[in-house]
């Protein structure tokens, strides 16, 4: 996998999306204690995306912590004409994700947690399928893993030492 981490977030205009919020109950001798866990995806809708998990006693604090964690976990994704350059399969835990490029006008054909990640990165046309676990934690991580493994045609051509046209035509 190529080094596609984003170093600085100062000049980026990141938009955050809440994927899931989970109320956790801890039973103690004195009664029940409630806390919240929030999965957040941030992206600039131009090829940069990240995810974070925030935990706190209040929902708003958990979301804020998730956003800060997501800003520390950004990757660069090659987006070409609103779609991805090639098909990609990735797994995380019990979740398996397949993302495929789609022609212009198709839209984002993905469900739940995958849709939030794909729209945050700025992909407008893609076909996505999830198998196995539908746990939002694992779906977000598997989708980010699939996007992280994508390579642009220019990178492939440079690694092979051939022209970009040769990559497309074989």
From Swiss-Prot:
One GO term of the biological process aspect: translation
Keyword tags: Ribonucleoprotein, Ribosomal protein, RNA-binding, rRNA-binding
GO cellular component, one term: small ribosomal subunit
Occurrences of domain S5 DRBM (ranges): 14-77
One GO MF term: rRNA binding
SUPFAM superfamilies assigned: dsRNA-binding domain-like, Ribosomal protein S5 domain 2-like
Keyword Aminoacyl-tRNA synthetase on entry: no
Keyword Acetylation tagged: no
Top-rank taxon, per record: Bacteria
NCBIfam families, per database record: rpsE_bact (TIGR01021)
Family: Belongs to the universal ribosomal protein uS5 family.
Quaternary structure and partners: Part of the 30S ribosomal subunit. Contacts proteins S4 and S8.
Entry remark concerning the domains of this protein: The N-terminal domain interacts with the head of the 30S subunit; the C-terminal domain interacts with the body and contacts protein S4. The interaction surface between S4 and S5 is involved in control of translational fidelity.
Entry function: With S4 and S12 plays an important role in translational accuracy. Located at the back of the 30S subunit body where it stabilizes the conformation of the head with respect to the body.
Stated name of the protein: Small ribosomal subunit protein uS5
Organism: Parabacteroides distasonis (strain ATCC 8503 / DSM 20701 / CIP 104284 / JCM 5825 / NCTC 11152)
């Amino acid at each position: 996998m190529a080094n596609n981490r984003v170093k600085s977030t100062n000049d980026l205009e990141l938009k955050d999306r809440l994927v899931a919020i989970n109320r956790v109950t801890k039973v103690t001798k004195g009664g029940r204690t409630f806390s919240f866990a929030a999965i957040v995806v941030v992206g600039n809708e131009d090829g940069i995306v990240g995810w974070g998990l925030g935990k706190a006693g209040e929902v708003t604090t958990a979301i804020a912590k998730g956003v800060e964690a997501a800003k520390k976990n950004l990757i660069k994704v090659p987006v070409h004409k609103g779609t991805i350059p090639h098909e990609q399969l990735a797994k995380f835990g019990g979740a398996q994700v397949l993302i495929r490029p789609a022609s212009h006008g198709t839209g984002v054909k993905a469900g739940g947690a995958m849709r939030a990640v794909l729209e945050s990165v700025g992909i407008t046309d893609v076909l996505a399928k999830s198998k196995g676990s539908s746990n939002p934690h694992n779906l977000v991580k598997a989708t980010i893993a699939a996007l992280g493994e994508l390579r642009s045609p220019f990178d492939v051509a440079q690694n092979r030492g051939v022209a970009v046209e040769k990559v497309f035509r074989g």
